Amino acid sequence: MTHSLYRKNIISISDLSQLELRHIMDTAAYFKNTPPVNLLKHTVIASCFFEASTRTRLSFEAAIHRLGASVVGFSDDQFTSVSKGESLSDTLRVISSYVDAIIIRHPKEGAPQYAAGFCPVPIINAGDGTNEHPTQTLLDLFSIQETQGRLSHLKIGLAGDLKYGRTVHSLTKALSTFPNNEFFLISPPELSMPCPLVKELNHSVHHTIEEVLPQLDILYMTRIQQERLKPEHRHLKTAFILEGKHLLPGQVKTNLKILHPLPRVDEIAPEVDTTPYAYYFQQAANGMFIREALLALLLNPHAPYP
């Protein structure tokens, strides 16, 4: 019988049930220990990045190659007919006739949802403006499960740009579906989490990392995104910096893990990298396994793995 993820559009993390989240993570864990070979041979996947990306684009493309599939696409829309005035719908309609799935990153919120309305192949949202980034959330959940052994009964700090940061928007939506999670929202007032996202959360609001750090199981740091800031808010760019002095023995829980969607600028000092709490590079590496799992499940109807 065909499983529920087969040919499914991945637009929002809310599109996935807890059972589907577990299926993707279990498959990623399996692939991490047992690399897949030619599972998607003769499959062609489009990587359409209308906005700059390093980790997301390259981890998707590495995942595609490791699955035995082929990838076509672009990393900048200036090299496409969009730069000549072609509409997004015309571009993607044509691309969808060549491929089995489309990965899209776009600066406009809602672009992947729009594409899903007319493309006959699965659409995967690789980030749409300040809205969502569901595949980043999948690797975040996988990293939390890997380090904490659970996705419930956690104390989670979200720090930095909570207003424009799409990664924290998706992660909050996902973790709020698991029981007894408590959220500590740490940001300047100008960059606080949008009200619709916090309305149903068990949360508290804070303006410094130090005041909540001793309580946390997970600290999810984010970059203050200057490219999305209004000029009057640009002074906030370096407002939240985590340093080694904040992580001395006895000051934090032994199971604390620090995550970051990357790229970082200066919000995490380099000396933090060598502490046992830093997990952001392992988190980034997990992106390839999660994206392998997602593509394999979307494009294989029988999913012959756990």
Swiss-Prot record:
A single Gene Ontology CC annotation of this entry is: cytosol
Pfam families the UniProt entry points to: OTCace, OTCace_N
Question: What does the record give as its pathway?
Answer: Pyrimidine metabolism; UMP biosynthesis via de novo pathway; (S)-dihydroorotate from bicarbonate: step 2/3
What top-level branch of life does the organism fall under? Bacteria
Q: What class of enzyme is it?
A: transferase
Function recorded in the entry: Catalyzes the condensation of carbamoyl phosphate and aspartate to form carbamoyl aspartate and inorganic phosphate, the committed step in the de novo pyrimidine nucleotide biosynthesis pathway.
At which positions is L-aspartate bound? Answer: K84, R166, R223
Protein's organism: Hamiltonella defensa subsp. Acyrthosiphon pisum (strain 5AT)
Instruction: Give the E.C. number(s).
Output: 2.1.3.2
- Family (UniProt): Belongs to the aspartate/ornithine carbamoyltransferase superfamily. ATCase family.
**GO aspect biological process, one term:** 'de novo' UMP biosynthetic process
Q: Which reaction does it catalyse?
A: carbamoyl phosphate + L-aspartate = N-carbamoyl-L-aspartate + phosphate + H(+)
**What is the protein's given name?**
Aspartate carbamoyltransferase catalytic subunit
Q: Give me the residues that bind carbamoyl phosphate, please.
A: R55, T56, R105, H133, Q136, L262, P263
Q: Which gene encodes it?
A: pyrB
